[in-house]
């Protein structure tokens, strides 16, 4: 067994104060996302998405956030993937944005709902053609014999769709995560981190400080 207990560091990049928080958590999220992009973080839109199966077994994976607004957070995926199948069983979902270099993280609890075909189509046609073709290739989360099988299927589909537009697969779509709570975490000195949680209450958000 490896002992990692001596790996530690101080958090020194600043605090988070109640008086500085906007009433709407999405406004703070937009500020933090902008700062993450300006800091040239690797994949600032990458989020850990957690879902659960029919037995309550959770599973997590990294997915890219594609849009956010006051209604929530949007991502796209293969509808035959493990995440989509689990969402169909249980729409409760958790998102985590781990912005380690900024000593920040944002944790979201909410419910996922399918996007309309219009919203899916709008995003799909904006993707590079190779990415559109790749959506046809992978039966996500299924077992395959070798990578060559994927590459062969990609080349086959690339030839098939060489001319004209790539149609949207029926098994490809997206989800809107409507947040019920959003927690903002900022690292602090001596492990006295700042944590604030926004909880949806009717049409407003309640803001509470949490112990680190």
From Swiss-Prot:
Entry's EC annotation: 1.4.3.5
Ranges that cross the membrane: none
Binding site for substrate: 8-11, 66, 123, 127, 131, 191-193
Protein name: Pyridoxine/pyridoxamine 5'-phosphate oxidase
Assembly and oligomerization: Homodimer.
Pathway: Cofactor metabolism; pyridoxal 5'-phosphate salvage; pyridoxal 5'-phosphate from pyridoxamine 5'-phosphate: step 1/1; Cofactor metabolism; pyridoxal 5'-phosphate salvage; pyridoxal 5'-phosphate from pyridoxine 5'-phosphate: step 1/1
Function, as annotated: Catalyzes the oxidation of either pyridoxine 5'-phosphate (PNP) or pyridoxamine 5'-phosphate (PMP) into pyridoxal 5'-phosphate (PLP).
Cofactor requirement: FMN
Matching SUPFAM superfamilies: FMN-binding split barrel
Organism expressing this protein natively: Shewanella denitrificans (strain OS217 / ATCC BAA-1090 / DSM 15013)
Catalytic activity entry: pyridoxamine 5'-phosphate + O2 + H2O = pyridoxal 5'-phosphate + H2O2 + NH4(+); pyridoxine 5'-phosphate + O2 = pyridoxal 5'-phosphate + H2O2
Family: Belongs to the pyridoxamine 5'-phosphate oxidase family.
Record-level GO BP terms: pyridoxine biosynthetic process
Molecular function GO terms recorded: FMN binding; pyridoxamine phosphate oxidase activity
Organism lineage: Bacteria, Pseudomonadati, Pseudomonadota, Gammaproteobacteria, Alteromonadales
Binding site for FMN: 61-66, 76-77, 82-83, 105, 140-141, 185, 195
NCBIfam families assigned: pdxH (TIGR00558), PRK05679.1 (NF004231)
